[in-house]
Amino acid sequence: MTAGSDLDDFRGLLAKAFDERVVAWTAEAEAQERFPRQLIEHLGVCGVFDAKWATDARPDVGKLVELAFALGQLASAGIGVGVSLHDSAIAILRRFGKSDYLRDICDQAIRGAAVLCIGASEESGGSDLQIVETEIRSRDGGFEVRGVKKFVSLSPIADHIMVVARSVDHDPTSRHGNVAVVAVPAAQVSVQTPYRKVGAGPLDTAAVCIDTWVPADALVARAGTGLAAISWGLAHERMSIAGQIAASCQRAIGITLARMMSRRQFGQTLFEHQALRLRMADLQARVDLLRYALHGIAEQGRLELRTAAAVKVTAARLGEEVISECMHIFGGAGYLVDETTLGKWWRDMKLARVGGGTDEVLWELVAAGMTPDHDGYAAVVGASKA
C-alpha cells in the first residue's frame, strides 16, 4: 500500500510529466496512426517509471492506478495501451528476470532508453497460450526461438520482445504445455507491416516472424513457469486498462454534460430533459463505483490475477456503454468524425473488450475463484422442505 505522501508526490510527478508535449505527441500520433517512441523516452527521463517501481519486484498498485488515470485522461486508447504494455513488460522482468542481462534490459526500459513489448497471441490459439506454436529449444549454450506472433503491439518501435513460447527440449513433437518466456531483441526478428485497425490508431500492431538464437541469460521464465510470468504481466495490463477506462469515461461524461447544458431542444436544455439527465446520472454513478473499486484494490496493496481480471472485464463493458450513450446524446454530430471525437472514442473502446483478454476468458478466471456456500444452500433447501 502506498503511503499518502508518496502517492501525492507521484501524482505531482505525473502532472509535470504529462505536459503540453505529451498532448501534442498524442494528437500527432492519432493523426499519423503511429506510436511516438519519444513519449516513452520522455516518461522515462521524467522518472515516471523509476518512481513507480523504485526497487520493488512487484508493482505499487496505487501508482499503477494513478498512471492509468493519467493515461486515460489523454483519451487515446492507442497511447494508453501502448505505455501500459511497455510497463507490463517491465513488470514481467522485475519479478521473473534474474540474470544481469535481463536486469539491464529492465533498467533501460525504466529509464526510457529501451522500448519493450510482449509477443503472446498467435493465429493458432489467440488467448489459449498453452498451445502456442512458437518453439524454444536449447542450442549452443543458449536457445533457438522459432515461430510467428500475430498481434505484437509496439513491435515496430520496440527494442526487445517478451516472447511466449513452448519448450520442445523434452519432446520435439509436443503441441501443448511447457510454456516459457524469453526476451528476444527486436533487431533479430522480422516485423511485418502494421495492421490497419478499427480503432486505437497509434497502437502500432504487427505480426512478428522469429527465427533466431538468444543467450541463456535471455530466458525470463523457464519451461513450465511461462504461463505464470505472462499471467503476471497481463494482470498488470488489465489493472491499467481498467484505470484508463475510468478516466476516459469520466472525461467523456464531463464533455457530454457540457453539451447537455448548452444544447437546447424543445425549449429546454438537454440536461433539463429528465430522461437524458437520469441516464447520465446512472452512468456517472457506475463510473464512480469503478473508480472507488480501483482505489480499494490499491489500498490492499496486492496485484491479484482474478481481481485484475474482474475489474478489467467489468470496466471494459461499462466503458463501451458509457461511450455509446455519450455518442448517442450528441445526436448526429456525434456520428460526424469532423465535428466530434465521440466516434473515435467509441471505436477505441472496443479494444478494451478484446485486448488483454476477452470478456469470456476473464470471466473464466473469475468463475474459477468462486466459492459455493454448501452450508447455506443446505439450510435454505432444508428450511423450504420443513
UniProtKB/Swiss-Prot annotation:
Can you cite a GO biological process for this protein?
fatty acid beta-oxidation using acyl-CoA dehydrogenase
Q: What pathway or pathways are given for this protein in its record?
A: Siderophore biosynthesis; mycobactin biosynthesis
Q: What is its EC number?
A: 1.3.99.-
Judged by the first EC level, this protein's enzyme class is oxidoreductase
Q: Which cofactor(s) does the record list?
A: FAD
Sorted alphabetically, which Gene3D superfamilies does this protein's record hold? Acyl-CoA dehydrogenase/oxidase, N-terminal domain, Butyryl-CoA Dehydrogenase, subunit A, domain 2, Butyryl-CoA Dehydrogenase, subunit A, domain 3
Which parts of the chain span the membrane according to its record?
none
Gene Ontology molecular function = acyl-CoA dehydrogenase activity; enoyl-[acyl-carrier-protein] reductase (NADPH) activity; flavin adenine dinucleotide binding
Arranged from A to Z, the UniProt key words for this protein are: FAD, Flavoprotein, Oxidoreductase
Induction is noted as:
Induced by iron starvation conditions. Transcriptionally repressed by IdeR and iron.
Against Pfam families, the record matches this protein to: Acyl-CoA_dh_1, Acyl-CoA_dh_M, Acyl-CoA_dh_N
Give the protein's function: Catalyzes the dehydrogenation at the alpha-beta position of ACP-bound acyl chains. This results in the introduction of a double bond in the lipidic chain, which is further transferred to the epsilon-amino group of lysine residue in the mycobactin core by MbtK.
Q: Which PANTHER family match?
A: LONG-CHAIN SPECIFIC ACYL-COA DEHYDROGENASE, MITOCHONDRIAL (PTHR48083:SF20), MEDIUM-CHAIN SPECIFIC ACYL-COA DEHYDROGENASE, MITOCHONDRIAL-RELATED (PTHR48083)
Q: What is this protein called?
A: Acyl-[acyl-carrier-protein] dehydrogenase MbtN
